[in-house]
Amino acid sequence: MSATEKRRYEVLRAIVADYIASQEPVGSKSLLERHKLNVSSATIRNDMSVLESDGFIVQEHASSGRVPTERGYRLFVDSIHDIKPLSLAERRAILGFLEGGVDLEDVLRRSVQLLSQLTHQAAVVQLPTLKTARVKHCEVVPLSPMRLLLVLITDTGRVDQRNVELEEPLAAEEVNVLRDLLNGALGEKTLTAASDALEELAQQAPTDIRDAMRRCCDVLVNTLVDQPSDRLILAGTSNLTRLSRETSASLPMVLEALEEQVVMLKLLSNVTDLDQVRVHIGGENEDIELRSATVITTGYGSQGSALGGLGVVGPTYMDYSGTISKVSAVAKYVGRVLAGE
């Protein structure tokens, strides 16, 4: 990169920083006043003209300054080398808050609450998918003579419950046999790999519990194996209401994408790397609902394996360095808590 190119990048960086702080078009005079660029106003104006020609900034009105384009934000983000570190107090607060979680879902709920507060954006986390989870235990609880509760516990800490209606009541000993057979068939298997075992078990169970076993297996296969219920936890969607006038028109589409979850589930399901933070700016998002927003995501998990994705959704003029740092930190601390460190 030549000296001229370096200077122009510094001008772009200053424009992005000022626009993020104010959401107001940035002019050459304010750049010289706020930043030590050590060049003349004529040079700044020339650099801004070149940056505009190259598509990194745009002048929205003839009498106004410039604002960054999505291409300008992308160059800015790709050039970030010094991610803002969290203070010791922030790190202790994050870990202490997450360690107060009573189970996996509570830890994840706390993580998005914390992330939305730290970044002032909407935060989202994907609960571990059942598709890759392994069964640790299947509890069978009689709710009434004609109804059972199946409680499935996976190695990710996720707990799912389903009711099973019976044709005939089961004795306590029969419930115990049914429980043991289910755990024998499901133990340490992924739910996708358990389907064949459950179908075989339904056919080979002892005659006196075969109908009950068939009903239990049907419920597990139909609702947990064939149609695993991936879910999201959201926090801080109200933060999006502070969007600038230029982007507030797209707010309903962004909120709809968050609330209906399908778009975000698809995006987070592709997050498999624990060490990489991904930044999708505006039109880089595949789904039209998010093309006016920036989405920053990473994976969380333990022992080198990702259990799901988490991240934030906000305007394209967000504090990229600080937000990337906080998304990464919260994900790492979630992993530490899940690993019991």
UniProtKB/Swiss-Prot annotation:
It comes from the Bacteria. One of its GO terms (molecular function) is DNA binding. One of its GO terms (biological process) is negative regulation of DNA-templated transcription. Pfam families: HrcA (PF01628). Keywords: Repressor, Stress response, Transcription, Transcription regulation. InterPro entries: GAF-like_dom_sf (IPR029016), HrcA (IPR002571), HrcA_C (IPR021153), WH-like_DNA-bd_sf (IPR036388), WH_DNA-bd_sf (IPR036390), WHTH_transcript_rep_HrcA_IDD (IPR023120). The keyword Repressor applies. HAMAP family: HrcA (MF_00081). Negative regulator of class I heat shock genes (grpE-dnaK-dnaJ and groELS operons). Prevents heat-shock induction of these operons. Belongs to the HrcA family. NCBIfam families: hrcA. This is Heat-inducible transcription repressor HrcA.
